[in-house]
């Protein structure tokens, strides 16, 4: 974590290194996310590890998966520059959804966000901390979905002074460890066990 932080952050300090290390742990694995499934499908065909990891990299590149923290970073940046309420309103107006909020697995807050939020709070000055707290409160008042790990990661990148695309880098580096474990696990299963069927549907 120390070497990675030194390359991504302009002023790496011990608190930031601890936060990045925690993020790497939190992001290493999360059940059968789409990129993890891609790795396991490749492993089921007995592709070698490097090819299976390439399958995961292709999927994680999507803005709704590994790149989602970049959109959340933009929301946090806009909340700082425009104010939380205006940032929320304009994001919903143009994107029709709030990046960094909602997750298919969790009904409420993503517990990974909760951990990252605590670490971000330690890095931010009180006035910047209040901006994120206000954004969260406004989202709650509007009954929007709870915050997810992408918001936590985007906020961490912002607090660290990192570039907005560093979240994707951190996410991918962390997830490679999890993918490798899934790859090895899949090799113990029956080969080519993922075979979906399709039903042809004509127009009425």
PLM features: residue spans?
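Hydrophobic alpha-helical bundle cores within soluble ligand-binding/oligomerization subdomains
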Residues: 1-204
């Amino acid at each position: 974590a120390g070497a990675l932080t030194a390359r991504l952050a302009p002023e790496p300090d011990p608190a930031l290194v601890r936060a990045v290390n925690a993020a790497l742990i939190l992001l290493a694995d999360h059940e059968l996310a789409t990129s993890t499934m891609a790795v396991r499908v490749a492993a089921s065909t007995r592709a070698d590890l490097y090819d299976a990891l390439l399958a995961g990299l292709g999927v994680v590149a999507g803005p709704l998966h590994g790149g989602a923290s970049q959109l959340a970073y933009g929301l946090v940046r806009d909340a700082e520059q425009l104010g939380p309420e205006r940032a929320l309103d304009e994001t919903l107006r143009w994107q029709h959804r709030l990046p960094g909020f909602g997750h298919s697995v969790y009904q409420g807050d993503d517990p990974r966000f909760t951990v990252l939020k605590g670490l971000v709070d330690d890095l931010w000055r009180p006035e910047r901390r209040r901006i994120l707290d206000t954004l969260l409160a406004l989202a709650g008042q509007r009954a929007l979905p709870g915050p997810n790990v992408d918001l936590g990661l985007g906020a961490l990148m912002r607090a660290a002074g990192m570039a907005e695309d560093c979240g994707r880098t951190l996410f991918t580096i962390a997830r490679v460890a999890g993918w490798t474990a899934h790859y090895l696990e899949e090799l113990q299963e029956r080969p080519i066990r993922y075979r979906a069927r399709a039903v042809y549907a004509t127009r009425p």
